[in-house]
Amino acid sequence: MGIKHLYQVIQENAPDAVKAGEIKNHFGRKVAIDASMSIYSFLVAVRSDGQQLMSETGETTSHLMGMFYRTLRIVENGIKPVYVFDGAPPKLKSGELAKRFMRKSEAAEAHEEAKEVGTAEDVEKFSRRTVRVTREHNEECKKLLKLMGVPYINAPTEAEAQCAVLARAGKVYAAASEDMDTLCFDSPILLRHLTFSEQRKEPILEIHLDRVLEGLDMDRKQFVDLCILLGCDYLDPIPKVGPNTALKLIRDHGSLEKVVEAIQSDPKKKYTIPEDWPYKDARELFFDPDVRKADHPDCNFKWEAPDVEGLVKFLVEEKAFSEDRVRNGAARLQKNLKTAQQSRLEGFFKPIAKTEQEKATLKRKHEEKLELQKKKKKEEAKAKKEAKSKPRGAV
C-alpha cells in the first residue's frame, strides 16, 4: 500500500523533486526493483478477458509473462535490474495484512456475485481486488530470473528497505517501486512506473529524497513522522486527518510526539487518536529496518548470460509459452546484457553542493510558487462557487 497521498503532497509542495522522463533516459544504470510489488502489478495487468493468463493445465502464468517481457524491455533500454523479494513482514504489519486479506475475501465473494448478476465492468473490478502474490508466484519468478541471468536478492523483511540500502551504498542508482514508503526507508532516489507495460505510455517518475525534504522544509525524522500521519502499512491513520491537515500538524508542532500531545490536550477533541497507535514503533521500523548491509555476501550480485535451453524447458515445455518468442527474447536478452556494461558519464563526476545563499534563493522561489498555486486554487474555487450560486439560465 505504501503512504497515502504522499505523492500528492510532494507534487503540491516539492514539485522540483519529481522528474518525469522516458525509460531510455536511464541507460547504463543499475536499479534495484521491488519484486513483490512488480509481480502484483503483473498479475493485475497481464490479463485476458478479466481472467489471469493460464497454461493448458490451469496454472497462472501472468506473473511469468510479465516478469519475462517487462524485464526484457528494461534490459533492452540499457538498464541492469536486480530484483529484491520480500521476506517475512514485520510484526507491526500483521494488522494491515489481516485487513488486506479480509478485503480480498470480501472482493472474492463480490466477484462471484458479479459473475452471476453484474456487468462485465463489475466482474473485472472485483477480480482485480482478489489478486494475491503467493509463495509459488515468487519461487517461479526467481527460477525465471536465474534462467534469464538476472540477479535477485531475498530481503530479510521489506524489499523496499533492502532496495534503499543498495541505493544508499551506490550499488544501484535507484530503488524502483510503486510503494512511496521506499522514501521513508531513506532511498536517495525512487523510480516509479519502471515495470509498467509500454502500452500504458506512463513516464518514468524519478523522485529525489533530498529535494523532497528541501521542498517540504523538513528533516528526515519530520518527513517520516508526516508519512506515519498520512497513513502507512504499520498503523491506522488518525480519523479526519487528511494530507493537508497532516502537513499542517507536523509543520506547527515539529514532531509526532508534540502532535499527539496537542491532540490529546485539545478541549474541543477535534481528532481522536486510535487506542492502539504505536507510532514510535512504526518510526523505528523506518529508521532501523531488518536489512542486510550492502557489503553482505548476499548483496553481491552479477548478471550472467541467459540459459536459453533452460528457458525453453521452463517456459515452453512446462508453461506452454511460444518457443519462437522465448528464443527470440533470450537472444535479445543476451545481446542487451552485454551492451548494458557501458557506464554513464555521471558516474565519474560528483555534483557540486549548493551554497547557503543558493539554497535560500531556491527556498524563496519555491515559497512564491506555492503562494501563487494557493491563490490560483482559491480563485478557481470562488469562481466555481459563484457559478453554482447563479440561477439556472442566468447569463
Swiss-Prot record:
It comes from Blastomyces gilchristii (strain SLH14081). PANTHER family: FLAP ENDONUCLEASE 1, FLAP ENDONUCLEASE FAMILY MEMBER. InterPro entries: 5-3_exonuclease_C_sf, Flap_endonuc, HhH2, PIN-like_dom_sf, XPG-I_dom, XPG/Rad2, XPG_CS, XPG_DNA_repair_N. Its cofactor is Mg(2+). DNA binds at residues 47, 70, 158, 231, 233. Residues 357-389 have a biased composition (Basic and acidic residues). This is Flap endonuclease 1. Interacts with PCNA. Three molecules of FEN1 bind to one PCNA trimer with each molecule binding to one PCNA monomer. PCNA stimulates the nuclease activity without altering cleavage specificity.
